[in-house]
Amino acid sequence: MKKNYTAIILDIQHSRKFDDDKRLYIQDKLFSIIKFINDYCNKELVKKFEFSAGDSIQALFYNISDAFSCYCFIKNLFYPYQIRCGIGYGKINQKFMDQNYVSTNMLDGEAYHYAISALHDCKLEKYDFLIYSSNEERDYFVNQIMSTVELLNLDHTYKQADIFNLFNLLYPLEIRRGGMNIKEISTFIINKLKENVLSYKFEDFTSSGSIKLILGEVTYNYQERKKQLHKLFDQRFSTKINSVCAVLLNVSRQNIEKMRVVGKFDEIRKLECLVLEYIRNEYEHEKKD
């Protein structure tokens, strides 16, 4: 039986609204992210991310769950700008695979056709995310949950959105290491947080104390979650993260806790965890049958 792969195509939302300078800045931001992700997820990628056309990037994953968690991470790294995502799960033309093309632009097959259709419908129906495969029933289940996630995110104020981004980058849905060490990962996250969080002033963000705090938090998360490789660490954010964010943003812990509850941070994370587990159980089990 032919193996299924996962094609993922992302593009920048509303890119035509930006002037040339802003658009160049945003494209540079996305370029730095995919360069990082290609190292961060190098064991999960069949073909690395690359620009395919205009503001679009695409890649090919072995597993659909890895593609989904990678999308969630890229979305948070790219914040406050938005991306659309089409994921396609299916076969790849084996003749193209046998040629061992380096570029994903040279590949073809139903996984790519599904991903292209999913991205097209995202634009048409104004969704952020859609997943398509040969099983419409399970696709519908995933897409409905992710639609709920989008609606919950839309309810966030600017400050809530900034704090939620901080939560997600310090405590991603899943961990990866690739060929990178924790310090490299932490440094990249620190640089992105300085770009992303706009509602608060990070006077001491580049101080040794703040960097040590973030490095310590990322290290702790990675070490603890490494013990449960490819398993969910928790369906809630850690309670410790409230204090970490309060120190970084120079606000009270109670303020962070209130934002967390009102913004339904844990509810959103639980829904994303549900999607991740469902994808593993309902899509990837086919390979074992």
Where are these regions (language model features)?
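Regulatory and interdomain segments flanking nucleotide-handling catalytic cores
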Residues: 1-289
